[in-house]
């Protein structure tokens, strides 16, 4: 509140939440949607996306023929992959922080990250290459700015889609 211009409209309320996801979003004849399937964080609108993606996936994979064990396994694998990519994007914001004014921010900067995110960070550090996977919610234009590094080779990174136009000017 120290940086707030003017008086606060009300006292801030602490809202506690637990992050995570179900191991099986589709289990037997039940498919969890929304907050019953998992929760990542309150600042991005990822929950809305995950609901829409879950419903779309279920419509595409609905077991009209009766059997559903293989479909449920595939549904769960795709859902888990989607949760993990979104998780990586959120963790990246904390991991790459330049803040070190509190133990919280130092712990974020020093934390161990999932292998999938560690690879993404290493590739970007080494080459300035940022990418969007086929099923990633966040595009290159979202990943690249978060992955910025002061005086880094990544400054020469050209966002996908702009390369053709740039090549035409050379």
Label every PLM stretch briefly.
Residues 1-97:
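FAD/FMN-dependent oxidoreductases across multiple families
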Residues 60-170:
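Long, low-complexity C-terminal extensions of enzymes
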